[in-house]
Amino acid sequence: MSVKGFKSHPYIPNSVPEVEQEMLHEIGLNSLEELHEEVPDEIILKNEMNLPEAFGSEYELRRHVEKLLKKNSSCDDNLNFLGAGCYQHYVPAICDEINGKGEFLTAYGGESYNDFGRFQSLFEYESLMAELLDMEVVNVPTMDYSQAASTAIRMGSRVAKRTGVLVPGSMDREKLAVIKNYCTPDLTIEEVKCDEKTGCMDLADLKAKLNDSIGVVYFENPNYFGAFEVNSREIANAAHDAGAQCVVGVDPISLGVVAVPRSYGADIVCGDLQPLGIHMNYGGGQSGFMATM
């Protein structure tokens, strides 16, 4: 079998046969077969691959890919109400403009001597989030809401010096899986029943499961079903009476209308930053926050 080079390929550098031969000569070889001679013969493909003819230009390739993409139903043309951690909110143009600024967007990890732009941006973000949440301390963003909730729960358990955690039985199963991954085996996660009529946490079941081993009571406003825990203060009081920390997950957009978690007794607040100007991106590109006093 002869391994052939390309006459000229727009996407593969050094693909011209003359350049290929020059490179082989430099390392003392005559052909690509010699370069691959240590690969076992039985796993080498010897027949021609059934590939379509290559596109001759970037323009042709782009038109082909765009034609394929048009078969999809896009959220640019349709509204999406799936939710569950990835929400279709309008993102003002100023968000993309600021996010793309060179002093903020960089491929470099960043050090204290050259990353002042990012530090300034994060300081302003933390200050505004603290004002929105009415809390004193806000962290730099986490990877997503699930990580923020998991870390907040572990924070609360360390403060309470207990290993038991109560979470709502109605919460997102994927988020619960992440919480269990972060917290076990150090912490024990137990679910509180959901009131089937209201979609909220069952207070009787919550109080029955509170004991001196419970360090954290976690709930969300709004919860997975979109319902608000109208008994939020009673939940927080029950947690505190049992010596536990109250951790609340929130949608920050809702805080323009509803009371902040601190007002009904939350010790730690966490939530999702994706609604605040982050585009949907195949379920990725998420971000979360944590705040405390």
What is the predicted function of each stretch?
Residues 37-124, 130:
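N-terminal entrance/gating region of PLP-dependent enzymes' catalytic architecture
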Residues 112-114, 131-151:
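Short loop-beta-helix segment that forms the pyridoxal 5′-phosphate
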Residues 29-43, 266-271:
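TRNA-binding/sensing appendages of the translation machinery
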Residues 11-12, 147-293:
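Conserved PLP-enzyme active-site core in the AAT-like
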Residues 1-16, 23:
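Charged, compositionally biased N-terminal leader segments and the immediate start
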Residues 2, 100-113, 128-135, 160-161, ...:
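Gly-rich Lys/Arg/Thr-decorated short loops/hinges at beta-loop-alpha junctions or inter-strand turns
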